[in-house]
């Protein structure tokens, strides 16, 4: 996600409803749980109240249990201040693209930089080149830990469904996404699945919850049912639908939905709870 010109990341939606429309709670509950070998970490509750802001000065006064804010832009002092108010803090970090405005952009060699993803200055990366990409991401996760964050929101974990410039397969994406979850856990933080609805059945056991964008608008919400069945939170952000158009549906599913302005500058926050 670029912090300059907000737009929804481009991704293929074909077949999502067909695959997941018949998903039952019983089937979802049967999904295997993957044990974490890392240190103990925060376990987000299913009914997690949350606030999301990635640009601008962040106020600490939102009446929620968790904040999701930018890992690079947020100082450790603000994370500490939020902790002193009894809040948990989630670290937004991009793991699927390289953003030319980030301080570590020069760490990405040209060989892993693909096509733009619709955001200025942002390109998909070749997640198959694990020997190159993983050390960069580990340093990003370590930055989150050093600042005191409790969890990570890894963005753009669905390059295989986009025109990335690389012939990424679903299996390669799963390998990378599972590594992301395990690496974050190894550093003592929780981790949320960000979008990627088609791979939820395989990913739920690795992640501690999910954050989805516009699942009501794009009719993808049922794909995240396995998280609810497992007692994990599903945080849904809608940008264009009025709350009266989606809050009842989110509540009936057990999702924690809210409406935000697309720029995520803190200008709009209309929660469903």
List where the protein language model places each region.
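Secretory targeting and sorting signals
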Residues: 2-31
């Amino acid at each position: 996600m670029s912090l300059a010109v907000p737009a929804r990341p481009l991704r293929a939606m074909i077949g999502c409803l067909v695959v997941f429309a018949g998903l039952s709670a019983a089937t979802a509950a049967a999904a295997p749980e993957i044990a974490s070998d890392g240190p103990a970490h925060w376990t987000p509750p299913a009914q997690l109240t949350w606030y999301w802001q990635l640009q601008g000065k962040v106020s600490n006064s939102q009446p929620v249990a968790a904040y999701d804010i930018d890992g690079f832009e947020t100082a450790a002092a603000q994370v500490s201040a939020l902790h002193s108010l009894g809040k948990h803090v989630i670290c937004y970090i991009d793991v699927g693209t390289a953003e030319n405005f980030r301080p570590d952009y020069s760490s990405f060699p040209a060989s892993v930089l693909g096509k733009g993803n619709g955001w200025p200055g942002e390109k998909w990366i070749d997640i198959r080149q694990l020997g190159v990409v993983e050390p960069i991401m580990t340093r990003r996760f370590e930055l989150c830990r050093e600042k005191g964050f409790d969890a990570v929101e890894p963005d753009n974990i669905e390059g295989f469904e986009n025109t990335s410039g690389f012939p990424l397969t679903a299996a390669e994406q799963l390998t990378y996404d599972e590594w992301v979850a395990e690496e974050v856990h190894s550093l003592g933080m929780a981790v949320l699945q960000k979008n990627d609805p088609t791979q939820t059945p395989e990913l739920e056991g690795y992640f501690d919850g999910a954050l989805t964008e516009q699942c009501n608008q794009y009719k993808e919400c049922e794909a995240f049912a396995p998280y609810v069945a497992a007692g994990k939170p599903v945080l849904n952000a809608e940008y264009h639908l009025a709350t009266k158009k989606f809050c009842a549906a989110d509540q009936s599913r057990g999702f924690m939905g809210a409406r935000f302005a697309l720029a995520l500058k803190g200008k709009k926050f209309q929660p469903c709870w």
